[in-house]
Structure formats: C-alpha cells, structure tokens
C-alpha cells in the first residue's frame, strides 16, 4: 500500500512538472497586445559596446554570448562568455538553450528583462518597435533562425536602412579565430543587417507556434 502511495506521489509530481514546463512555454506564445509605437525615430542611434568582446561563439552557445553583450552594454563589464555558458540552465541536446535559460542568466547577472511576442504586428511595426527600444537605451535579444538554426543575437543600434548587432555567429577572423570580422567598422557591433534581413530572420525564429517573433528587452536593475 505504501509503495502504491509513493508511486502515485511520483506520478503526481511528474505531471505537475510537465504542466509547469508547458505553462512556461505556452504563456510565451501569447502575443503582446497593446504595444505603442513611436514613429519619430532618429536617423541613427546606437548603444555602446566594447569591440574587445566580438567573440565567435563555441558550439550552440549563442545564448550566453548574447548575454555577454548585454552585460557589457549596460554595465561596461567584460564577462568570460565560456564562464557564462557553464552557468546557463534550461539546455537540451547539443547545448540548445530555451528562452528561460537566457532569462535566468540575465537575472543572475542583475539585468532586468521584459519579454515580448510581436507576431500579430506588421513588419514595419516590428522595425519601429526595435528602434523604440534602442531610443529608450534598452538593448534587445531576438530569437531568430539563421540557416535552419535557432539563434540569439543582440540588437544594439540602427540607421535608416537597418540594424547594428552583436552576433556571435558572425564569420571568424583569419588571424584570430576567437574573434569575428566586422561588417561596418564605422558602426557599433560586428554585424549589420538591413531592415528586411533582420525581419525575415526574426519571422522565421521560434519553435512551431511557440516563441514566434520573440524578444527580450534588457535594462539595468
């Protein structure tokens, strides 16, 4: 009888865990309603980031590398991305990181966050929204799909035609394979995407119906 009771308790906790995990994922599939857009953007705006941290990521470690970029932008601190990778939770096979792992790592490093899902908005509204966050001095991490791979990168600035990023999947330098090349040396960040390029990558990101057009806006605590 006692064994039967223990079995039922275990089953209960397994079901509860499944419900909690599904709840966390499901809530993030709900669109962010009521977003206000300010179309009076600057021609150009950006947040400062150290060019010393334009590292090329190790296998599937885009989440901790994106967090490294956020920490540097908001605090000026240079963190070891591999140390951040070791601290990252919510990981599955081959180091793939669920958004909750990204959020937890940001919180652990005293970065406040707010999540959004912009799947119900137009592409133009998404572009305006990204610019609004930069104008508010808040960097953003987006979940995108690059060459059939789910990927996180950090948006740090914009001009009229596109966006400046720190992207740990940028091509490696020939002379130092731990560092990446830089698309536009006169800009902040190591990667530049046109408006259409970044929106297409963002639209393709997410897992089926979950985390579509998902973003996390970051700020100082």
Where are these regions (language model features)?
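Active-site-adjacent structural segments surrounding the nucleophilic cysteine of cysteine proteases
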Residues: 3-95, 146, 159, 219-220
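Extracytoplasmic/secreted envelope proteins and their assembly/folding machinery
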Residues: 63-71, 81, 85, 99-103, ...
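Short aromatic/hydrophobic-glycine micro-motifs
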Residues: 76, 111-112, 139
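A structural preference for short, hydrophobic beta-strand core positions in alpha/beta folds
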Residues: 115-116
């Amino acid at each position: 009888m006692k064994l039967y009771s223990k079995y039922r308790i275990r089953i209960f906790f397994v079901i509860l865990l499944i419900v909690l995990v599904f709840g966390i994922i499901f809530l993030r599939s709900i669109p962010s309603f009521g977003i206000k857009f300010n179309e009076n953007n600057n021609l150009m705006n950006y947040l400062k980031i150290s060019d010393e941290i334009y590292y090329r990521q190790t296998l599937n470690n885009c989440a901790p590398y994106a967090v490294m970029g956020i920490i540097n932008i908001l605090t000026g601190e240079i963190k070891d991305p591999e140390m951040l990778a070791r601290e990252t939770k919510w990981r599955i096979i081959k180091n793939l990181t669920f958004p909750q792992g990204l959020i937890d790592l940001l919180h652990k490093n005293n970065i406040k966050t707010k999540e959004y899902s912009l799947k119900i908005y137009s592409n133009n509204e998404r572009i305006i929204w990204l610019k609004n966050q930069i104008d508010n001095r808040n960097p953003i991490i987006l979940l995108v799909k690059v060459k059939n791979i789910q990927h996180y990168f950090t948006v740090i600035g914009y001009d009229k035609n596109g966006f400046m990023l720190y992207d740990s999947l940028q091509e490696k330098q020939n002379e130092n394979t731990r560092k990446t090349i830089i698309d536009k040396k006169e800009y902040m960040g190591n990667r530049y995407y046109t408006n259409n390029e970044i929106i297409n990558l963002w639209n393709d990101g997410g897992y089926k119906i979950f985390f579509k057009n998902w973003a996390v806006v970051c700020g100082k605590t």
